[in-house]
Design a protein with these regions (language model features):
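Auxiliary Fe-S-binding modules of radical SAM enzymes
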Residues: 1-69, 100, 104-107, 134-146, ...
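Local cysteine-cluster metal-coordination motifs and their immediate loop/turn environment
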Residues: 50-62, 73-88
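A secondary-structure boundary/capping signal
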Residues: 52, 72-73, 117, 151, ...
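Short connector loops/turns at beta-strand edges and beta->alpha or beta->beta junctions
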Residues: 75-78, 111, 178-180, 247-249
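Glycine/Thr-rich phosphate-binding loops of Rossmann-like dinucleotide-binding domains
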Residues: 80, 124, 183, 252, ...
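Core AdoMet radical
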Residues: 85-101, 108-160, 165-201, 213, ...
Length: 310
């Protein structure tokens, strides 16, 4: 890319990308008592969180509310996505005790909703799906009232791996599309747009009432029509929940930010998504996959009851 340009504005013509972040992207530095408590627990249990590994801007707010997204299957990813701060390389051996440590941490925190995600483990035949299932089941054993959301990789299209996770019965199955198909080679090398879409169709066939969720990051240079088409594609495979957030560049080695979307544009995207039929749309500059995750399942289930769909 030659440099920042105005790309596909939703409401008005975009300005050339400013040198500084706009004011709506500023966040308070973390340091609350709950934040420090959770940080100590994660360290004591030898766990990883995507909040830390991916430099999430909401870490202070979420950890203050004792909400965290636990990262399983290690902290080294076999893929090297252009936007992601997680370390890429040769991963370590799987830790079979990890499900118990994660579940114990969730129990100690008294969480009502737990989010579990992972690095890609293309070195494993099942992509790590058995560990995902073990984590879900162990959380159910130790914290029966805790909702469980999993943010899974594409498992390279392995249907048996997906079934392993679905049959463990998470409350929400999340898989992020991240971007529009034209930008997949840059943003998600090693992944395929249609394969990720098909994951949702397969999951729906496996479990008709499973709540599904996906996320899109904006600011890579996508056009308006491409973004709206990706949202429509997700509705076509009956995705229930959509998150939309601004791309923030982790380092100079990552993809550049082409445009900052305004809060007003995110509000418009939320309204458009709701009009398309998503049961919940979380949209905002700092929104990430697990942002306000706890309340989303209640809203989806309430709308399903109104529709007569359990």
């Amino acid at each position: 890319m030659s440099g920042p340009v105005s790309v596909g504005p939703l409401i008005s013509t975009a300005e050339i990308l400013p040198a500084r972040k706009p004011p709506w992207l500023k966040v308070k530095a973390p340091g609350s008592p709950n934040y420090l408590r959770l940080k100590r627990l994660v360290q004591d249990q030898r766990l990883h969180t995507i909040c830390e590994e991916a430099h999430c801007p909401n870490i202070g707010e979420c950890w203050e509310q004792l909400t965290a997204t636990f990262l399983i299957l290690g902290d080294i990813c076999t893929r090297n996505c252009g936007f992601c701060a997680v370390t890429h390389g040769k991963p370590t051996e799987l830790d079979l005790a990890e499900p118990d440590r994660v579940a114990q941490a969730i129990q100690r925190l008294g969480l009502e909703h737990a989010v579990i995600t992972s690095v890609n483990r293309d070195d494993q035949a099942d992509g790590g799906s058995a560990i995902f299932a073990a984590v879900i089941r162990r959380i159910r054993e130790l914290s029966p009232g805790c909702g469980v959301e999993v943010l899974i990789p594409d498992f390279r299209g392995n249907e048996a791996a997906l079934r392993t996770v679905v049959e463990a019965a998470p409350d929400i199955l999340n898989h992020n599309m991240e971007t529009v198909p034209r930008l997949y080679r840059e943003v998600r090398p090693g992944s395929r747009y249609e394969q990720s879409l098909e994951l949702f169709a397969k999951a729906r066939r496996m479990a008709a009432t499973l709540v599904t969720k996906s996320g899109i990051i904006v600011g890579f240079g996508e056009e308006r029509e491409e973004l709206l088409q990706t949202m429509l594609d997700l509705r076509r495979v009956d995705c229930d929940i959509l998150t939309l957030g601004q791309y923030l560049r982790p380092s100079q080695q990552h993809l550049p930010i082409i445009r900052y979307y305004t809060p007003e544009e995110f509000r418009e995207l939320k309204a458009i998504g709701e009009g398309m039929g998503f049961k919940h749309v979380e949209a905002g500059p700092l929104v990430r996959s697990s942002y306000h995750a706890r309340g989303q399942i209640e809203e989806v289930n309430q709308k399903r009851r109104v529709e007569g769909r359990k």
